[in-house]
């Protein structure tokens, strides 16, 4: 967890719980490990007596997996297990902004006697490493997690060879609060939905839709919760919001704040 924290600024408390024994991420590996011998074919009645009609499952072969910077370990775990269980080999491409935790985890997995060539990692930028990986003729399937623009580019490249691609892209998830809501509970829920990982997640509740009849009361209490937040070093226990992962995002946030203030918001 500490390695990923140093990569992307995410608090250890938001990383390590899902990696402990019994947590859902590791449980998913047990689940998919149990599926390895469950892929079965099917015999289908044929129309003609001399016809043999059946269905069987076959691995795609080489699968390219593109990982995001905001949750690299978690994304790797839920991508990798089903892919290997189905008999595929994998080439991982972590984000250039958060590669260290993935490289460390790869060392651990390779020590577990995974056969040579089954699990591979390449690092680099999207345009110099990710795009050629997706375009490589030996890659038969692509799994991409990242921003919407990156997903569009990946889908365009994969489509040139009619490669199947699975994508999990960025979102703008609204949090809706209606008049009959428990305001205290709703305020805490809204704060918990946006502040983890500094709001840098595809599941962050980055839009608020509040009924006009409770907007003043809700806003007042939400501001109080925000003022209790501690922004700082993510490795300090007192910190509740770590740093933004890169300067581009940091400056975009400041620009949005500046625009809001110029429009009369405070």
Write out the residue ranges for each language-model feature.
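ALDH superfamily catalytic-core signature
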Residues: 135, 141, 149-266
């Amino acid at each position: 967890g500490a390695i990923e924290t140093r990569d992307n600024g995410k608090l250890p408390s938001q990383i390590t719980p899902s990696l402990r024994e019994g947590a859902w991420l590791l449980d998913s590996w047990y689940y998919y490990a149990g599926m390895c011998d469950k892929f079965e074919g099917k015999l289908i009645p044929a129309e003609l007596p001399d016809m043999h009609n059946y269905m069987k499952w076959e691995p795609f072969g080489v699968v390219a997996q593109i990982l995001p910077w905001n949750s690299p370990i978690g994304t790797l775990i839920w991508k990798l297990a089903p892919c290997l269980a189905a008999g595929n080999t994998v080439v991982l491409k972590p984000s250039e902004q958060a590669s260290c935790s993935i490289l460390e985890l790869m060392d651990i997995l390779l020590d577990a006697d995974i056969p040579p060539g089954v699990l591979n990692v390449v690092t680099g930028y999207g345009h110099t490493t990710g795009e050629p990986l997706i375009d490589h003729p030996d890659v038969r399937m692509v799994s991409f997690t990242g921003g919407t623009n990156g997903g569009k580019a990946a889908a365009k490249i994969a489509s040139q060879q009619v490669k199947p691609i699975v994508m999990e892209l960025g979102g703008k998830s609204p949090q809706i609060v209606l008049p009959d809501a428990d305001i205290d509970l709703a305020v805490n829920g809204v704060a918990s939905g946006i502040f983890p990982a500094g709001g840098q997640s595809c599941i962050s509740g980055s839009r608020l839709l509040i009924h006009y009849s409770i907007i003043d009361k809700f806003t007042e209490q939400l501001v109080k919760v925000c003022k209790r937040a501690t922004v700082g070093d993510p490795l300090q226990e007192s910190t509740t919001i770590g740093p933004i992962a890169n300067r581009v995002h940091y400056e975009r946030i400041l620009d949005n704040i500046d625009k809001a203030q110029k429009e009369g918001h405070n």
